Amino acid sequence: MSKKGSYKSVGGDFRYGDESVSRFINAVMLDGKKDVAAKIVYDAFDIIAEKMTGENPLEVYRKAMSNIAPVVEVRSKRVGGATYQIPMEVKSSRRGALAFRWLKLYAAKRGGRSMAEKFAAELMDAANEQGASVKKRDEVHRMADANKAFAHFRF
């Protein structure tokens, strides 16, 4: 079987039936404790619903994920003894994985509250084009833009 086969569907989550939320819960999960991860994510969604009245937390989550996910990134390639940073498009599966990773990282770095509150704050900031995870995406895009002269080295 080839390595580039299709990915297994993780199915929808318990509350919303959304596969992306289910993947996010899996990304948050530590040591196989999925119930704890689901509680954190759903509590974060409840906080979003409470603080942003009239907003659907799932829509805030989707908007935040689209604002965090990078479109291009730089990848290293060695050409004739020199290493170049080559801007390349990011595949959709990697876009989601990077968005989850950055959201998790920068939410954890926030102040000393519960993890659900940290996720809620980072998601709300990301939905409003603010927050550390969006800054990380902008930084990655800036790096790709700065190195677009090496785009002809794409592999």
From Swiss-Prot:
Signal peptide limits: none
Key words of the record: Ribonucleoprotein, Ribosomal protein, RNA-binding, rRNA-binding, tRNA-binding
Xref: Gene3D superfamilies: Ribosomal protein S7 domain
A GO MF term: rRNA binding
GO CC field: small ribosomal subunit
Any one Gene Ontology BP term: translation
Pfam families: Ribosomal_S7 (PF00177)
InterPro entries tied to this protein: Ribosomal_uS7 (IPR000235), Ribosomal_uS7_bac/org-type (IPR005717), Ribosomal_uS7_dom (IPR023798), Ribosomal_uS7_dom_sf (IPR036823)
The protein's role, per its UniProt record: One of the primary rRNA binding proteins, it binds directly to 16S rRNA where it nucleates assembly of the head domain of the 30S subunit. Is located at the subunit interface close to the decoding center, probably blocks exit of the E-site tRNA.
PANTHER family: RIBOSOMAL PROTEIN S7
Entry similarity comment: Belongs to the universal ribosomal protein uS7 family.
SUBUNIT field: Part of the 30S ribosomal subunit. Contacts proteins S9 and S11.
Protein name, entry field: Small ribosomal subunit protein uS7
Source organism (scientific name): Chlorobium limicola (strain DSM 245 / NBRC 103803 / 6330)
